[in-house]
């Protein structure tokens, strides 16, 4: 059904007032999903229009979009989308800052430790001495990534593990906000064999210190880039310091479409939201800004790759992972981050007079307010 925006608003105002333990009836679920489809179709149409304006837009086997240098496109992303997946390794349970877009916002003091001397790989805990056993039994991944909070809180613990995976010839990339990085620690990571480092430049609001650390990292690590959620704050801060950032000669910029969970969604209260394939909930402006960013990069011929790490990309990522794991046709772990749909977060976009559905039809008989039997 092509529900009208007016009818969708009436229903979602009702849904947002329901007690948390009250489940919608089948016909109400149809209305909910019809509304999500209408919003998503309008967002997809806008994105298609923006992409049509990027002259040299490229794809990686239709799994993601990027502009710029093919050689500088991050191999960590190739592994994630074409290889064995992200293959996350976790160690640190602390961070030196708190970002409003962080998935752990508000709970940073309550993150459980991995364990003294231990590393979490594939949801299993290992001592460093166990890694040789792991490599001798399991098929080697195409790449691994050091994720979760801030590794430079205890970066000295990482060097020997990085060296071990480097000796095994496995591609490795690491995420950091870059604030605590030093020339000494970046050099040590490079000497240990880290292939790629990604700075969340948005976390520091594009601070001069982190920009300088990006430049230093280029001296020691093969591939250096930025990966940060695309927000209006990052977009503005980046272009205020664009030349200084590009002068670091970084290799890539991954613009992640911001998606929200129960920890951080209140930080974006009142923003226009959409839900992608009944999964990730995102502000509508995040990918819009990414595509505008990519258009500028393409027109100005920046000597790097700019990658659109969108909800579409993450959907493709999870399909690739399930196929590599030998799961059934269509299997994927992609899904919603919320245990219950937060209907109220869709009220702003339904109330926005400037946001239009592409096609609207009258509700069928039996679906109009007052016609459903409770």
Predicted features along the sequence, with ranges:
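Mobile, glycine- and charge-enriched loop segments
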Residues: 52-56, 83-86, 100-109, 117, ...
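Conserved C-terminal portion of the radical SAM core fold
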Residues: 211-317, 332-341
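Conserved alpha-helical substructure of the radical SAM core
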Residues: 65-66, 73-90, 94, 100-101, ...
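Structural recognition of alpha->loop->beta junctions
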Residues: 186-202, 242-255, 327-350
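Flexible, acidic/Gly-rich N-terminal and inter-domain linker regions that tether
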Residues: 1-88, 97, 363, 373-374
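Core AdoMet radical
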Residues: 106-126, 137-154, 166-181, 189-209, ...
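Accessory C-terminal segments flanking Radical SAM cores
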Residues: 2-12, 305-374
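Distinct, well-ordered alpha-helical segments
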Residues: 155-162, 182-190, 209-213, 238-241, ...
């Amino acid at each position: 059904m092509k529900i009208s925006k007016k009818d969708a608003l009436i229903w979602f105002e009702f849904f947002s007032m329901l007690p948390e333990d009250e489940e919608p009836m089948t016909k109400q679920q149809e209305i909910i999903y019809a509304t999500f489809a209408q919003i998503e179709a309008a967002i997809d149409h806008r994105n298609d229009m923006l992409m049509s304006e990027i002259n040299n837009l490229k794809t990686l086997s239709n799994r993601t979009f990027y502009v710029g240098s093919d050689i500088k496109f991050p191999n960590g992303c190739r592994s994630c989308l074409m290889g064995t997946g992200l293959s996350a390794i976790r160690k640190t349970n602390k961070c030196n800052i708190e970002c409003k877009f962080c998935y752990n916002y508000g709970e940073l003091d309550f993150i459980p430790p991995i364990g003294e001397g231990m590393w979490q790989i594939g949801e299993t805990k290992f001592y460093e001495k166990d890694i040789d056993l792991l490599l001798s039994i399991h098929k080697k991944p195409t790449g691994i990534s050091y994720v979760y909070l801030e590794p430079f809180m205890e970066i000295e613990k990482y060097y020997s593990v990085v060296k071990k995976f480097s000796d095994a010839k496995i591609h490795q990339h690491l995420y950091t906000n870059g604030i605590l990085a030093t020339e000494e620690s970046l050099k040590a990571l490079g000497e240990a064999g880290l292939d790629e480092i990604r700075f969340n430049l948005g976390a520091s609001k594009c601070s001069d210190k982190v920009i300088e650390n990006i430049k230093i990292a280029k001296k020691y690590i093969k591939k250096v880039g930025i990966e940060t959620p695309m927000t209006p704050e990052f977009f503005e801060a980046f272009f205020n310091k664009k030349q200084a950032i590009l002068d670091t000669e970084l290799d890539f910029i991954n613009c992640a479409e911001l998606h929200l969970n129960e920890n951080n969604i209140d930080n974006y209260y009142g923003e226009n939201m959409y839900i992608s394939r009944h999964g990730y909930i995102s502000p509508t402006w995040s990918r819009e800004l990414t595509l505008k960013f990519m258009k500028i990069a393409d027109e100005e011929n920046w000597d790097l790759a700019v990658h659109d790490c969108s909800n579409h990309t993450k959907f493709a990522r999870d399909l690739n992972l399930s196929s590599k794991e030998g799961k059934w046709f269509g299997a994927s772990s992609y899904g919603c981050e919320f245990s219950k749909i937060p209907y109220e977060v869709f009220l702003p976009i339904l109330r926005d007079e400037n946001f239009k559905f592409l096609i609207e039809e009258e509700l069928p008989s039996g679906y109009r307010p007052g016609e459903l039997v409770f």
